[in-house]
Amino acid sequence: MRQHIICGIDVGNSAVKTIIAGVDREIVRPQIMGIGSVPSTGLRRGAIFDMEETINNIGDSVNQAESMAGVKINEAYVSLNGLHIRTQLSRGVIVVSRADNEITQNDIGRVLDAASTISLPPNREIIHVIPKSFTIDSQEHVKNALGMKGIRLEAEVLLVEGLSPHIRNLAKCVNANN
């Protein structure tokens, strides 16, 4: 069976670390294939102050991990951290779209979008929406609303937000390494 390759990159204040793992359906845990770690010389307090250094640090860390793993990666999960990251709770509500009142994946997407529609300053953006629970016609604390029946669907979510310039700068540094 062919392994699915995943990669994670952590760009921190003190080091840039990369891990490459192989995952297949028969193995419960990912198998570590390669790691890379180099000192971080372009970040301070979670913010990039030298893009060229950060680009080089990411490239060096990824190259170490690729060399150890014997594979070339083309996508990665990248950590985003720093003092600019904030969270807040939000709620959204919609009317279920189907005539038979069965909640679909589309309804869940719509209610999550409704919960994500908040006023943010122009320099901040939502990074992630984490559903906490749903309420269906006053039935609270529903973990998975898919396939259930109801007229009114509410969602309580945790919104993770950050400063847009920091997010874009990190993405630019990662993407510069192809």
Predicted regions and their residues:
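Nucleotide/phosphate-binding catalytic cleft detector across ATP-hydrolyzing
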Residues: 1-15, 19-178
